[in-house]
UniProtKB/Swiss-Prot annotation:
One of its GO terms (biological process) is symbiont-mediated suppression of host innate immune response. Belongs to the orthopoxvirus OPG062 family. This is Phosphoprotein OPG062. Keywords: DNA-binding, Host-virus interaction, Inhibition of host innate immune response by virus, Late protein, Phosphoprotein, Viral immunoevasion, Virion. Self-associates to form high molecular-weight forms. Interacts with protein OPG157. Interacts with host RICTOR and RPTOR; these interactions disrupt the mTORC1 and mTORC2 crosstalk. It comes from the Viruses. It comes from Vaccinia virus (strain Copenhagen) (VACV). One of its GO terms (molecular function) is DNA binding.
C-alpha cells in the first residue's frame, strides 16, 4: 500500500445540510493540497446526487415472533429421502468393491 494512503476508521456518519450519510469505506489521503472555496462558487462544491427513493423512512418494526398460519389440511412438501439413501448406499457399495478388488 502506498505510504500516502491509509484506511480511515469506518463506518462512520457525516452530518450535512442535506441529511446524515453513512460512510462505509473511506481512504485517508495525506500530503494533498486543500482548496478553500465558498458555497456561492459552485466550481469546487461537492456534488451530492439526490436518492431516487423518498427520504429516510422508518420501516415498521418487525413482529416480535413468527406468526404461523395453521391450516390443518395443508402440509409442507418434503423431498423423498430414500432417493438420497439409495445414492449413498450405491456409492458405499462402489467404494467397498474397489477396495476389495
Amino acid at each position: 500500500m502506498n505510504s500516502h494512503f491509509a484506511s480511515a476508521h469506518t463506518p462512520f456518519y457525516i452530518n450535512t445540510k442535506e441529511g446524515r450519510y453513512l460512510v462505509l469505506k473511506a481512504v485517508k489521503v495525506c500530503d494533498v493540497r486543500t482548496v478553500e472555496c465558498e458555497g456561492s462558487k459552485a466550481s469546487c462544491v461537492l456534488k451530492v446526487d439526490k436518492p431516487s427513493s423518498p427520504a429516510c423512512e422508518r420501516r415498521p418494526s418487525s413482529p416480535s415472533r413468527c406468526e404461523r398460519m395453521n391450516n390443518p389440511g395443508k402440509q409442507v412438501p418434503f423431498m423423498r429421502t430414500d432417493m438420497l439413501q439409495n445414492m449413498f448406499a450405491a456409492n458405499r457399495d462402489n467404494v467397498a468393491s474397489r477396495l476389495l478388488n
